[in-house]
Structures are given as structure tokens and as C-alpha cells.
Amino acid sequence: MTVQAIAGVSPSSEAVVMTEYPSIAAGGIAQLLGSIYESIPSPAGLPKLSYLFALATAPFGILLYALQKLFGQRYVLTNRAIQGWTARTSRMVSSLNLSDFDRVEVVQSAGQVFYNAADLRFVGANGETLLRLKGVKDAGAFRNAIERTAESRRMVQESLATISARG
């Protein structure tokens, strides 16, 4: 059994905090469908007619979902980085350390509104985009998890530096 000075903190290993699979709103075809769904007006007091149109195009949505699961990505938040992995294989396609970005922005295009999804844009200190996670379902919650994990990482690093400075 390993004793940790700070519960849940391991200075030598990386641990998964959260895994997020993007919605079909990550792709252009689904965003086009989402834009069409949102453009259908809803009569006052009645359910949105766009739900009926979405039901009619459901087989196409299922195909897009299957393709996303086969050939898309998954986003993994660890105690050290945010990573993009291929959905089926264990191949990392992108990574950004939690200390390397300045802020995380939620960018929602018109086609993503119907799916309650958005892109997460990681911005560096100089304003450049360091990483973009496309089509994240409930992006605000995932952004909060990333920001809290990054803040925790920073505080842990400060604590470990203070402890090691004591000698």
C-alpha cells in the first residue's frame, strides 16, 4: 500500500479523471442536420416540429453515430493532461498538458445547438488555439472539470514544491 501525503495525488503516475466521447455534432453533416432541425419553426404552445423531422432522419443519425464510434475520437482528461485518442484503438492523436493553456472557451456553432454540444477551444497566453475538442456533449460541464483539474494540478505542484523546499 502506498501512502500519499495528499489524498488522490500521485506525483509519479498519470490517472484518468474523466473520459468524454464527442456527439455526432463533431462532424459537418450532423451540424448541417442540426441547423435544419433548429430552423424549423415551432407553433406556440406545441412541441417543436424539429423533433418529428429528426425522427424521420433517425436512420441517418444512427449511421453517423456508428461511424463516430468506429472512426472518431474520445477525449481523456487525466491529472496531468487533456488527450485525444482514437475511439477504437489505443493511439493518442493529440495531447495538451494542463499547465500549457491559459483558458478554455466553449464555441458553439449553429448546427450544434440542437445536440446540446459545442467545441472546446484551448487558448494559450498569446491568444493562439492550442487544441480544439469538437462536438463535446454538455461542453460546459467538461470545461469545468478540466478547469478544476488544472487548478488542482497547479495547487499540487505548489504544495509539492513547498514540501521539497523544506528539505
At which residue positions do the language-model features occur?
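N-terminal basic, Ser/Thr-rich segments that initiate or prime the first beta/alpha elements at protein or domain
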Residues: 1-167
